[in-house]
């Protein structure tokens, strides 16, 4: 795997979850953005892969599992087999990336998306690999019990624009948010 993409929505206190749900009320257009970004493959005949921890998987309503038109990989050291609906189970992010490099999947997968939770984001951001981070900043505070790890802004640079990502502030149901894209570029060793 040559590059990673992570996508997350955070509120102002860097919260990403509360009691297994999102800390804020449903934002339909923000969810559509997540669906569009993670589903759209740029290579004919290939699909994107989404990698997530077990809690993130079970936070998705059952009727929406697996995330459709994407190869769903769940990470867990405890589970013995992939949860119902998931395509693959891996013990760690490294195992999942090795799986994606296997002949079975290499020819089928375009982009690799990390969709949570905290530990999976942290492991991905620490890897010395090109990485784009798609952050929806919700411009309000909401009570949260799960948080996004600290972003190292020495590595991750905010892009001024990115194709397909609206630049202006969005608003739904009185909640304002904006889309940001950060990029970490690692020179080939």
UniProtKB/Swiss-Prot annotation:
GO molecular function: dihydrofolate reductase activity; mRNA binding; NADP binding
Catalysed reactions, semicolon-separated: (6S)-5,6,7,8-tetrahydrofolate + NADP(+) = 7,8-dihydrofolate + NADPH + H(+)
EC number of the protein: 1.5.1.3
Protein name, UniProt field: Dihydrofolate reductase
The protein's annotated pathway: Cofactor biosynthesis; tetrahydrofolate biosynthesis; 5,6,7,8-tetrahydrofolate from 7,8-dihydrofolate: step 1/1
Protein family per UniProt: Belongs to the dihydrofolate reductase family.
Name of the gene encoding the protein in the UniProt record: DHFR
Enzyme class, UniProt record, top EC level: oxidoreductase
Summary of the function given for this chain in its UniProt record: Key enzyme in folate metabolism. Contributes to the de novo mitochondrial thymidylate biosynthesis pathway. Catalyzes an essential reaction for de novo glycine and purine synthesis, and for DNA precursor synthesis. May bind to mRNA.
Organism: Gallus gallus (Chicken)
Cellular component GO terms, alphabetical: mitochondrion
Binding locations of NADP(+): 9, 15-21, 54-56, 76-78, 116-123
């Amino acid at each position: 795997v040559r590059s990673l993409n992570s996508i997350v929505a955070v509120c102002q206190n860097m919260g990403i979850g509360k009691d297994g749900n999102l800390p804020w009320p449903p934002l339909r257009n923000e969810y559509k953005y997540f669906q569009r970004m993670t589903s759209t493959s740029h290579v004919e005949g290939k699909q994107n892969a989404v990698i997530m921890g077990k809690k993130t998987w079970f936070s998705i309503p059952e009727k929406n599992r697996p995330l459709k038109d994407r190869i769903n990989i769940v990470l867990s050291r405890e589970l013995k087999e992939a949860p119902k609906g998931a395509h693959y189970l891996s013990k760690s992010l490294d195992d999942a990336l090795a799986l994606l490099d296997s002949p079975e999947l290499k020819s089928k997968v375009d982009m690799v998306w990390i969709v949570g939770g905290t530990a999976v984001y942290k492991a991905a951001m620490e890897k010395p690999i090109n990485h784009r981070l798609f952050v929806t900043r919700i411009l309000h505070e909401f009570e949260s019990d799960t948080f996004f790890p600290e972003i190292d802004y020495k590595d991750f640079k905010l892009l001024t624009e990115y194709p397909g990502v609206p630049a202006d502030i969005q608003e739904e149901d009185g909640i304002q948010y904006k889309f940001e894209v950060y990029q970490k570029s690692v020179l080939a060793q």
